[in-house]
Amino acid sequence: MRIALVGKGGSGKTTVSALLIRHLAAGGRPVLAVDADINQHLGGALGLSEEQAAALSPMAAHLPAIKDYLRGENPLISGTEAMVKTTPPGRGSRLLRLEEENAVHSLCATRLPGDMENVRLMVTGGFEEKDLGVSCYHSKIGAAELYLNHLVDGPDEYLVMDMTAGADAFASGLFTRFDLTCLVVEPTRKSVSVYQQYREYAKEYDVTIRVVGNKVTGPDDVAYLREHTGADLVACLSASHYVRAQEQGRDKGFDTLEPANRTALARLQLEVDAVPQDWAKFTRQAVHFHLKNAHAWGDRATGVDLGAQVDPDFVMGPEAFAAQS
């Protein structure tokens, strides 16, 4: 199951992402954590030191190798230079499983230590000096979008992505690659406005949205969030001594997280687990955004008719993965 966490900058989505990842890991679930935020703070929130986080190998640095591996023997893709971030899989493409060992995981995924050993972390990579003034951050997350297009995941295994802030997620089709999108919303007008903007953008794409209230101080905050987000609100997180200790570099152990906050995370997991995986919709949306990007810039940039890469008889999912074995 795939969960994206988004929200206003400063809403605490990285903190909530890390809490959810720790909750799933504590339950023995395999988790792939992906940091796709420009600030790249998820590693630190999961307990890595600054040196360990800096040593992570970003997906963006391995984009040519990732393309080459995912292309496999797909006859509709002439070469890796013709692959763009939206390129959908087809017959002959290499599909991925979340727990398997493969070339992409070997290059980009780091298994976390200690009680997080069932968690692997991938990072898209932050801005470097050479990028400043000449590149946008969405060029960094292309590898993550390709990865998600080729991933076959199932129940009781989880991909949790800490996304870019606000409505930036709509700069590509990445926002349709998840089973559930969780908006982290503070009980403030600005934070609620980001939720409303996101819901408006997403409504025509059948995106499942839920809200987790964060930095909630009491019943008035809960009532405010309920008034403005309605049934989308599934849980609320309050101030946490555990989180503060983590942010200060003092690991007190996840079992010291406040019971009410643990209950909130369990509710969010239940919401994710209740979403049926619709691989036909997933495939349709992948093709839709690929063709949209092809017409907007892809054909011109590659010199290739990217629409010809679409395999009309291919549907992503477990059956497609089984067929390649």
Please identify what each model-predicted range represents.
Residues 5:
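Hydrophobic anchor at the beta1->P-loop junction of P-loop NTPases
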Residues 9-10:
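Walker A (P-loop) phosphate-binding loop of P-loop NTPases
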Residues 13:
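Conserved lysine of the Walker
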Residues 19, 134-253:
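Conserved catalytic-core segment of NTP-binding enzymes
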Residues 25-115:
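N-terminal phosphate/diphosphate-binding loop that engages ATP/GTP or pyrophosphate donors
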Residues 33, 119-121, 233-236:
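Conserved beta-strand scaffold positions in the cores of enzyme catalytic domains, especially
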Residues 94-114, 123-159:
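Cytosolic-facing regulatory segments adjacent to core modules
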Residues 201-325:
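C-terminal lobe/tail of nucleotide-utilizing enzymes
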